[in-house]
A protein has these predicted regions:
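Edge beta-strands of extracellular beta-sandwich domains
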Residues: 83-85, 250-253
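The conserved catalytic core of RNA pseudouridine synthases
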Residues: 130-161, 170, 189-190, 194-246, ...
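RNA pseudouridine synthases
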Residues: 1-187, 191-196, 294-301
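Thr-Gly-centered strand-to-loop micro-motif
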Residues: 52-53, 107-108, 151, 202-204, ...
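Short glycine-rich, acidic/polar surface loops and turns
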Residues: 260-264, 272-273
Length: 303
């Protein structure tokens, strides 16, 4: 999708501000609109009527530099992207960050022809021209919810894929697992082999891919544990297999866990944090979603 440029004809519909010193977008807006509450400013961002250098920006902590132009549309708000299984968290000329709901595939396989995050986003960007499309950078399992990033051109896709471990600084998940974790923190290392329908784990190098998961126990209650997980590698089903290795499978995981333990009717795994250096500007981008409420309830309610 091309940058959404503001035409000269429409210029009178915007209030323009020039950035004179480095600061985050929210701080800048608060200074320019002192009577507006933080909630009001976030609402303006969510309505997609804030532009930075002619690009719609919804990230409240977007880093501004001297010389940038911030524009606020006087329109009521742009028509937002709406879909029950995903939402756009951030978009610019190079990338789209989404929050995917559980149950939605990231991308089709040869055997699966259903609508996916990839096909839905392609339809969205093609509203601005049939030549536009998004490009896969990484994936989430169908039953895992959370943050994903797509590239909007092939050059950005190559940059992200070829430099993934240098560009992505933090990719974190939260899960609810069966039983109370023995350790407050630890690391799981194993070699994973993908047999299509099942990923097998070995504690020694048997020709599989070395896979490393760091974990931290947040809370134990009601026979469950709320756990944060940080991937050092990103293999297929890695977290699910590693939690099985620890003897604490993820709730709702019928493949690597217990089919009859599913109190919330879904896999209790969510990608809640994604931090990376922007592939074009080099700026550090931080995105974080709250823990799903249904996860927290499992370790809060009394039985």
């Amino acid at each position: 999708m091309a940058k959404e440029k503001i035409t000269a004809r429409a210029r009178t519909q915007y209030t323009d501000y020039m950035v004179k010193e480095p600061m985050e977008l929210m701080e800048f807006l608060a200074a320019k609109m002192p009577d507006a509450s933080r909630t009001k400013l976030k609402s303006l961002l969510s309505k997609r009527i804030i532009y930075v250098d002619s690009v719609i920006t919804t990230q409240y902590n977007f880093p501004l530099k001297p010389g940038m132009k911030v524009q606020i549309s006087r329109e009521k708000g742009r028509k937002e992207f709406n879909h029950k299984l995903m939402k756009i968290v951030y978009e610019d000329a190079y990338i789209i960050v989404i929050e995917k709901m559980q149950g939605l595939l990231s991308v089709n396989t040869d055997r699966q022809k259903e609508r996916t995050a990839y096909t839905i986003l392609n339809e969205y960007v093609q509203r601005s021209g049939k030549q536009h499309r998004v490009h896969i950078v990484h994936r989430l399992d169908r039953d895992t919810s959370g943050l994903m990033m797509f590239a909007k051109d092939e050059k950005t896709q190559r940059t992200l894929r070829d430099n993934w471990h240098d560009i992505v600084t933090d990719r974190r998940y939260v899960a609810v697992v069966v039983g109370e974790m023995e350790k407050d923190a630890g690391t799981v290392v194993s070699w994973l082999t993908d047999r299509k329908l099942y990923v097998y784990s070995s504690p020694t190098d048997d020709g599989g891919q070395e896979s490393i998961t760091h974990y931290r126990t947040i809370k134990r209650a009601n026979g469950y544990s709320l756990v944060e997980l940080n991937l050092e590698t990103g293999r297929k089903n890695q977290i699910r297999v590693h939690m099985q290795d620890l003897g604490h499978p993820i709730i709702g995981d019928g493949r690597y866990g217990l089919e009859d333990v599913n109190p919330i009717g879904r896999l209790a795994l969510h990608a809640f944090k994604l931090c990376f250096y922007h592939p074009d500007t080099g700026e550090l981008m931080r995105f974080e979603t709250p823990y799903p409420g249904e996860f927290k309830k499992l370790v809060l309610k009394n039985k």
